[in-house]
Amino acid sequence: MKTKIIVIVGPTAVGKTALSIEVAKRFNGQIISGDSQQVYRGLDIGTAKIRPEEQEGIPHHLLDVREVGESYSAYDFVTEAAQAIREIAAQDQLPIICGGTGLYIQSLLEGYHLGGSVPHEEILAYRAQLDSWSDEDLFRKIAELGIEIPQLNRRRAMRALEIAHLGGSLENSQPDYEALLICLDDERERLYERINHRVDLMLEAGLLEEARWLYEQAPISQASKGIGYKELFPYFEGRMSLEEAVDTLKQNTRRFAKRQLTWFRNRMSVTFYQVGNPDYKNQVMEDIKNFLDK
């Protein structure tokens, strides 16, 4: 029998963290972070990491599990998230994955384990290339390679081409989980306003000092490539004013939110919930209850 899990995804600043706490309290759950930057100790403000006092006693997993100079891959996430799911389920509690790193979460859910030898950037670059192809292009390539896929659709075709391209580096296995995928969304203008406001709050909370610490500790690390930090490095180097750096940070965060939504829409079988709908939380709770009662 497959383990049932809840997955809460969506663009940055849409309200995933707050909802995950409510779901965990309502359904006796524990939360697994699905964010590639929140694994790093010391990166709290720029990653919008939930603070201990905000956790309301709910256990959280995969926060602060790496030093900023260390690497972290989708393979690491799949391995460690699977272990956390087993531990939570063994306690008769509900595993809840919450985050916005689509590559990591998709890899876990679809039962494909990304070998550590495959560079993260290579996987992302090839997936971006496939995203730009039409359905006709994808299906033509599938036919050329002689790949047989039952119930062929865009998502299955892209996944099969990734496996072929990476030379079998993705080990195919059946997913171990039955997941309900919840994707939060909001009107573009309102989401972008929330992003801009969040950046302002981060700066007030000490983002500049946190980014400078990262710049001094590990300026060329994987952690330093995250949005929220790298945009401030030119300011530290005297190549950009603070105002210009902050404007770049806000712009990059808005673009990132757009890419996140594209990923979830094209890559994962999510159900969208509009946070502007005053009844959306009630609908989420009802859908989770029905899912768990099946």
Swiss-Prot record:
Family of the protein in this entry: Belongs to the IPP transferase family.
SUPFAM superfamilies documented for this protein: P-loop containing nucleoside triphosphate hydrolases (SSF52540)
BP terms from Gene Ontology: tRNA modification
The keyword Transferase belongs to this UniProt entry's keyword annotation: yes
Record keywords: ATP-binding, Magnesium, Nucleotide-binding, Transferase, tRNA processing
Organism the protein comes from: Streptococcus sanguinis (strain SK36)
UniProt-recorded name of the protein: tRNA dimethylallyltransferase
Catalytic activity: adenosine(37) in tRNA + dimethylallyl diphosphate = N(6)-dimethylallyladenosine(37) in tRNA + diphosphate
Annotated residues for binding of substrate: T12, A13, V14, G15, K16, T17
GO molecular function (one): tRNA dimethylallyltransferase activity
Residue(s) at site: Interaction with substrate tRNA: T101, R127
Subunit structure: Monomer.
Binding positions (ATP): G10, P11, T12, A13, V14, G15, K16, T17
Interaction with substrate tRNA as annotated region, ranges: 35-38
Keyword flag Zinc: no
Top EC class of this enzyme: transferase
